[in-house]
């Protein structure tokens, strides 16, 4: 028996969770979603791209809303099939993000006269390396499908609209020294010791908080790794500390890199950028986004982590995270979602899409 998109979204969540779909193994769930949309949502144009399923209405509405969700999960940890205990549904992917997927699919099938045109994007391979992300493939191959006035990504957000996202860079800060026997340490130059001023500056760093569209983004500059040392009797001639800067979306990557260089200016070290991803502005002043905030009763907060909303922002589409799951429960063995939150998310989005 296939998916029943008109069923209660709680039941639909369970049905999706019970289809294993670890990254790179999404064909079965994509087949089920495609078949259900073709049979139960005749007002949508439906296409397939790899193991992603895309659907859209063409009703000539003045605005378009994109509902996007990944259909893959992290590896299963003996946490299938789904089960409901004390008002919570347990199972791999419940929170991240099959509950959100179920809400989107249910609304697509049951709203035949939306006030906005709707584009639905159910994509693969979000939980693994960025180069495999199905959304990136869709952008390359089906760019015209990624057009909207606002995009809603169903990532777990605790029922809040989490607007935009912070950017992230990683920088390796390296120090050079001179190797020597530790019994004659004065003959060497200890590279690890040269990192002490780096750690001092990190410890005393005052992170910036920025209010954008009523969302407060709090930056952070943190050491996340230290490498160094040769042997217990050798003064090391090389050492490094990896620093992660999470920056508010009013900075671009170049500005973030420049800021990190400023923080460590004057020290006897070198800096190498090893990873970078731009953030996304919330864009809540756009009419379609403002209406979404109103429908949510103003329950809005900043998104601190990086998500695929940044991909939409790079395309000029205001984007938010909104899903019934709890981000603190994603990827856990006891991953779960409150069933009442699924109903609440479906009700809120139905109001937004029909009024």
Curated annotation (Swiss-Prot):
InterPro entries: ArgE/DapE_CS (IPR001261), Bact_exopeptidase_dim_dom (IPR036264), Peptidase_M20 (IPR002933), Peptidase_M20_dimer (IPR011650), Peptidase_M20A (IPR050072), Succinyl-DAP_deSuclase_DapE (IPR010174). Gene3D superfamilies: 3.30.70.360, Zn peptidases (3.40.630.10). Disruption phenotype: Cells lacking this gene show multiple auxotrophy (Met, Thr, Lys and DAP). Pathway: Amino-acid biosynthesis; L-lysine biosynthesis via DAP pathway; LL-2,6-diaminopimelate from (S)-tetrahydrodipicolinate (succinylase route): step 3/3. One of its GO terms (molecular function) is succinyl-diaminopimelate desuccinylase activity. One of its GO terms (biological process) is lysine biosynthetic process via diaminopimelate. Its EC number is 3.5.1.18. The active site is at 72, 126 (proton acceptor). It holds the Pfam family M20_dimer. It is an enzyme of class 3 (hydrolase). Binds 2 Zn(2+) or Co(2+) ions per subunit. Zn(2+) 1 binds at residues 70, 96, 155. Zn(2+) 2 binds at residues 96, 127, 331. Transmembrane segments: none annotated. Keywords: Amino-acid biosynthesis, Cobalt, Diaminopimelate biosynthesis, Hydrolase, Lysine biosynthesis, Metal-binding, Zinc. Catalyzes the hydrolysis of N-succinyl-L,L-diaminopimelic acid (SDAP), forming succinate and LL-2,6-diaminoheptanedioate (DAP), an intermediate involved in the bacterial biosynthesis of lysine and meso-diaminopimelic acid, an essential component of bacterial cell walls. PANTHER family: ACETYLORNITHINE DEACETYLASE, N-ACETYL-L-CITRULLINE DEACETYLASE. Homodimer. Belongs to the peptidase M20A family. DapE subfamily. This is Succinyl-diaminopimelate desuccinylase.
């Amino acid at each position: 028996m296939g998916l029943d998109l008109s069923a209660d979204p709680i039941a639909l969540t369970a049905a999706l969770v019970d289809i294993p779909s670890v990254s790179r193994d999404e064909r079965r769930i994509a087949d089920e979603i495609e078949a259900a949309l073709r049979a139960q949502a005749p007002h949508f144009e439906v296409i397939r791209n790899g193991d992603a399923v895309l659907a859209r209405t063409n009703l000539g509405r003045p605005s378009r809303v994109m509902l996007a969700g990944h259909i893959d999960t992290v590896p299963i940890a003996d946490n299938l099939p789904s089960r409901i205990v004390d008002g919570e549904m347990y199972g791999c992917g419940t929170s991240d993000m099959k509950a959100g997927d179920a809400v989107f699919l249910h609304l697509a099938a049951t709203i035949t006269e939306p006030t906005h045109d709707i584009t639905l994007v159910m994509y693969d391979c979000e939980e693994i390396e960025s180069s495999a992300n199905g959304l990136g493939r869709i952008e390359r191959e089906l760019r015209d499908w990624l057009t909207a006035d606002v995009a809603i990504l169903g990532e777990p957000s605790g029922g809040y609209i989490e607007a935009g996202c912070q950017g992230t860079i990683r920088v390796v800060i390296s120090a050079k020294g001179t190797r020597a026997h530790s019994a004659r340490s004065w003959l060497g130059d200890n590279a690890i010791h040269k990192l002490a001023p780096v750690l001092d500056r990190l410890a005393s760093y005052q992170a910036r908080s920025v209010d954008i569209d009523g969302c407060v983004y709090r930056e952070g500059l943190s050491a996340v790794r230290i490498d160094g040392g040769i042997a217990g009797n050798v003064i090391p001639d090389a050492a490094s500390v990896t620093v992660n800067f999470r920056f508010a979306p009013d900075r671009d990557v170049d500005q973030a890199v420049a800021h990190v260089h400023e923080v460590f200016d004057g020290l006897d070290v070198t800096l190498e950028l090893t990873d970078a991803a731009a953030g996304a502005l919330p864009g809540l002043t756009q009419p379609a986004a403002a209406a979404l905030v109103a429908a949510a009763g103003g329950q809005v907060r900043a998104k601190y982590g990086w998500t695929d909303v940044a991909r939409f922002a790079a395309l000029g589409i205001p984007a938010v995270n909104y899903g019934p799951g709890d981000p603190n429960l994603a990827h856990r063995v006891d991953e779960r979602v409150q069933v009442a939150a699924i109903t609440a998310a479906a009700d809120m989005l139905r109001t937004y899409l029909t009024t």
